[in-house]
Amino acid sequence: MAKGVFITATNTDIGKTYITALIVKKLREANINCGYYKAALSGAEIINNNIVAGDAKYVYNVANIKGNPNECVSYIFKQAVSPHLAAKLNNVHISMDKIVADFNYRCNEHDYITVEGSGGIICPIYYDKEKIMLTDIIKKLKIPIILVSPSGLGSINGTILTLEYIKKHNLVVNSIILNNYDKSNIIHIDNKRILEEMTNLPVYTCEQYSEDIDIPLKELKQFYDFI
């Protein structure tokens, strides 16, 4: 039975893919069979007239995963817009059944599976007669969350609001990672302290351009839960 965790963030462009790649890399370098999955990706790359899931490609490259990165993403769209709008523009129906089936397939291939979300926690994945929000996917997959937040000014507000929304949907967050952390920046240092006190969650940091995630392997493994 595989163990899984879901990586989400306070907003888009916070560094989910970067953090996800470092987490998968750390586990794989410890000879742990860790895989990657993403339900929907927009803003894909076009390489030699072929659509490529850029986030997945990045994770594969950093974590040294062999194979076609497109295979670990259920829906891939060229337009750099929210998945629900990309689906509408391409007349594509996003199916929760397909997402769950693809996720389960990845779980059968790996002992640990790291799932990356789209955008921030409040992200519509499909918005037609049927509506799928990112939180609906997390509930279906039944895995805990690691929340990626910025380190600088505004981080406390964005992080606490995101946690409140997650709590409202009866989902579990087991840790926070502050991205682009500068250990000499008094704001970053204070934000980490305040968030630890306000949330009672472990708050880790990742410095800019780091090639490793500063989380002990034993603790990182504990953030994954059985699916």
Curated annotation (Swiss-Prot):
Keywords: ATP-binding, Biotin biosynthesis, Cytoplasm, Ligase, Magnesium, Metal-binding, Nucleotide-binding
Keyword presence, Nucleotide-binding: yes
Biochemical pathway: Cofactor biosynthesis; biotin biosynthesis; biotin from 7,8-diaminononanoate: step 1/2
Recorded family membership: Belongs to the dethiobiotin synthetase family.
Alphabetized Gene3D superfamilies for the sequence: P-loop containing nucleotide triphosphate hydrolases
Catalytic activity: (7R,8S)-7,8-diammoniononanoate + CO2 + ATP = (4R,5S)-dethiobiotin + ADP + phosphate + 3 H(+)
GO biological process, one term: biotin biosynthetic process
Binding site for substrate: S42
GO cellular component, one term: cytosol
Residues that bind Mg(2+): T17, D55, E116
Protein purpose: Catalyzes a mechanistically unusual reaction, the ATP-dependent insertion of CO2 between the N7 and N8 nitrogen atoms of 7,8-diaminopelargonic acid (DAPA, also called 7,8-diammoniononanoate) to form a ureido ring.
UniProt-annotated binding residues for ATP: D13, I14, G15, K16, T17, Y18, D55, E116, G117, S118, G119, N179, N180
NCBIfam families: bioD (TIGR00347)
Gene giving rise to this polypeptide: bioD
UniProt EC number: 6.3.3.3
HAMAP family: BioD (MF_00336)
Keyword Signal: no
Location of the protein in the cell: Cytoplasm
Residue positions of the active site: K38
Major localization listed first in the record, in broad terms: cytoplasm
GO molecular function: ATP binding; dethiobiotin synthase activity; magnesium ion binding
Cross-referenced PANTHER family: ATP-DEPENDENT DETHIOBIOTIN SYNTHETASE BIOD 2 (PTHR43210:SF2), DETHIOBIOTIN SYNTHETASE (PTHR43210)
Protein name as annotated: ATP-dependent dethiobiotin synthetase BioD
Obligatory cofactor(s): Mg(2+)
EC class of the enzyme, as a word: ligase
Organism: Clostridium botulinum (strain Eklund 17B / Type B)
